[in-house]
Amino acid sequence: MSNFHARREFLRFLAASPLLTQAWGQDAPGVIASAKDAINVMDFEPLARKALPPAHWGYMATGVDDDVTLRMNRQAFEHYQLRARRLVDVSKADLRTEVFGTTWDMPIYVSAVGSQKVFHRDGELATARAAKAKKAVQMLSTATSVPVEEVAKTLGTPPWYQLYMPLTWDETEKLVKRVEAAGCPVLAWTIDLLAGRNTETATRFTRLDNRDCLSCHMHSPKAGANPADNAGKPMLAGLAGTINPPQATWAYVDRLKKMTKMKLVLKGIDTGEDAKLAREQGADGVIVSNHGGRATETGRGTIDVLPEVIDAVGPQFPVFVDGGFRRGSDVYKALAIGAKGVGIGRPYIYGLSSFGQEGVERVLEILRAELSLTMRQCGTPTVASITRASVLKNGARL
């Protein structure tokens, strides 16, 4: 056997090794036969792992460097405990909350994940149909495999739009105007990948694949653009296709804000200092995010960053969070700390990979049910009644 083939076989063994499960997911007692069989959202993970080719699994499931931040996104939830109050009328739970003047049916949204056709043939449209059915807000990636206009039509309302900024302002304006023309109410500029990233574990998984990926990435950032000429085409049609300007500074926030009537949210905030700067520069909100442990190896879970950020900007400034959320009780902890909404990524992609729209719907059902139960168990039957009095960090009040 040649050295190349020996390395290839070793990587195949590595991909299947249960030793890696702790970093990239969690064990389940068995592979479920249908979406309705899922008891918690991670029941979809083993089936998704079997369904996806190595490169696609590696793209979704792994982190950067040694996957420390990826693991901490989960482990950090153990730092927080709940304070349950008793003898409150908990016969019903009301999960509704108001965000930017719009009432959400629940404080859980579908985070942006690119190129969803690599996970299921219907891609973002299956996710949109599920989000519509379960009354969840969807955030669409710049790297979408389906144009924003088509997603908006399927969803029944325009999604939030996650922006990977093109390198020039002319191209940025073309893309932003197209998204605005599609009716998107919120622009979430991702700022945590401007220096690139070291996805070495995912790279090892790609070595297991010999396929040409153009068939499933054809609408990704290779080809957004102006509404008149490019509606319905790939989001970066007519543009150079290069994104994430490394020279971007805080001055970009004001310029981007003046370019659109959409609300501007900065995604990828990891410190209180930057959250405060975002507010001062005119952003309408921030998303505490480390790209699911796939950007910078900070070693900090987003739930641990959240108190610092909210303390820096105050409770009136909208702060959202994503990264590692797998339980309704996880969502509850973020709401208690002060988050306005919580984004989920990998769980719904595992559902999508396993059962398409039905899988995404079931993930949203489970998280909603778990959050509702936690709210009632803790004596806080409305979102507004969830406060820092409901949570401890390492046994102490926040």
Task: State each model region's role.
Residues 302-308, 353-371:
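C-terminal helical cap(s) of enzyme catalytic domains, especially alpha/beta-barrels
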Residues 148-156, 279:
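Acidic (Asp/Glu)-rich catalytic clusters
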Residues 290, 294, 348-360:
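Short beta-alpha connecting loops at secondary-structure transitions
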Residues 29-101, 208-248, 384-386, 392-398:
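An N-cap/entry alpha-helix motif that binds or orients negatively charged groups
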Residues 1-18:
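N-terminal secretory signal peptides and thylakoid transit peptides that target proteins
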Residues 174-321, 337-339, 344:
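Alpha/beta enzyme core
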Residues 53, 110, 131, 189, ...:
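Conserved, mostly hydrophobic/aromatic
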Residues 104-143:
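Glycine-rich active-site/cofactor-binding loop and its immediate structural neighborhood
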